[in-house]
């Protein structure tokens, strides 16, 4: 009987220790998530109301991003610490769908010159065209949405015949856990 008791003690972990280890592991995980959230909040500078949320799925179906929450309006801008990444395109039960910026065809501003997002290139850079005065656009100029959210910077300007296209380096949210949804109408 003593031998069986000793074997049981050796091969089993008392439930209190197991529970304590689970609580410690969960606490460590939550502390790391809290630090990530604080880092994100401290690295964004948005002069409007915004809601911080996290991505659930970064690329399901047709290049859409799924985020938590449904207290958003269609076309609310979604940003990470590096700039605009997309627009709210669908709001449902507990989640919302974000269309990546390269699929939005929105108007953008480069030095007060309007253009339109046409597509993305193989490196996920934006191609901006329909520019009215491309002579005033240079590499490293900043690009903003028509609502003044930073998008990225110009990395090249291509002029051929009457068509001018600008390549804009942008950010993605594939590696980012948190995003902010800007609420200008709230």
Each language-model region and where it sits:
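Extracytoplasmic/periplasmic terminal helices and flexible tails
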Residues: 1-186
């Amino acid at each position: 009987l003593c031998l069986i008791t000793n074997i049981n003690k050796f091969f089993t972990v008392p439930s209190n220790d197991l529970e304590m280890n689970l609580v410690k592991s969960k606490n460590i995980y939550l502390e790391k998530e809290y630090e990530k959230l604080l880092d994100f909040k401290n690295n964004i500078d948005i002069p409007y109301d915004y809601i911080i949320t996290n991505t659930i799925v970064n690329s399901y179906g047709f290049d859409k991003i799924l985020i938590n929450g449904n207290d958003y309006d269609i076309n609310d801008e979604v940003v990470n610490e590096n700039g605009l990444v997309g627009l709210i395109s669908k709001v449902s039960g507990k989640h919302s769908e974000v269309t990546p910026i390269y699929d939005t065809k929105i108007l953008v501003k480069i030095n007060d010159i309007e253009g339109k997002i046409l597509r993305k290139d193989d490196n996920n850079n934006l191609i901006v065209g329909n520019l009215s005065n491309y002579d005033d656009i240079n590499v490293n100029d900043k690009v903003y949405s028509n609502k003044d959210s930073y998008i990225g910077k110009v990395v090249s300007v291509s002029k051929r015949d009457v068509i001018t296209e600008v390549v804009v380096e942008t950010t993605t949210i594939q590696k980012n856990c948190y995003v902010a949804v800007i609420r200008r109408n709230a």
